[in-house]
Amino acid sequence: MSYKLTLLGTGSSGGVPRLGNNWGACDPANPKNRRRRCSALVERISGRGRTLMLIDTPPDIRNQLLDAGVETIDGVVYTHDHADHTHGIDDLRRLAFNMKRRVDVYMDEPTRISLETRFSYCFRMAPHSTYPAVLNSLAIDAPQPLTINGAGGPITAIPIPQMHGDAGSLGFRIGDVAYCPDVGGLAPESVELLRGLDVWIVDALRYISHPAHFSVGQALKWIETLKPKRAILTHLHIDLDYAALQRELPPHVVPAFDGLQITWA
């Protein structure tokens, strides 16, 4: 039995390049600078098959799942309701049709209210519509663990409450790997949930400060505090060139890029 996490997207809300072919400080010749919006795929692999857990459905999710060869999914978890993490939700329809059943999606209460309002037809068949609802809404009660079952065996994730500007968001810990995009602060209780990590994938939006996201400097300070064995910086804006950022980081910290994979037992 083993686990694999694939970073399907590692960019900030506008991606890299931004519309208008704006690469900022990023070198267009380096494919690791082309970043779709943030999402991750967690797989548990055993002799019986695979269990797949998707984290977020950004606007790029269709191409991300095509690139990853994903045809079915056992469950989707949401970090929060912002557009760059949710507005590909309708593409779950195709997965539901492939599986001939609804897709289970896990959300905290603010995200549930938001998505069931904005995308109500995904959860409830609209009057006079011929399109069936395709999603089951399941509650996240952080920090209570949630479990997604599939052919490869159960994936258990601990939701970690995060500060994200005026709103909140969730990170997720699976074993000794944690995925924490869109974080601007951590309460003491959440800090305790992030100790003893082998790998921490963490938000590092820009060099300069931002009210809702860690900067590179803030992320490095938190890495120094929590002491994961390795760390990966994600949710990267156009001012963070991959090669330039890599040169500045300590040996156990690397920038993320779309398609990066980590495995563990």
Where are the model-predicted features located?
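Binuclear metal-dependent hydrolase catalytic cores
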Residues: 1-180, 184, 189, 246-265
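Binuclear metal-ion centers of metallo-dependent hydrolases, dominated by the metallo-beta-lactamase
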Residues: 143, 187-265
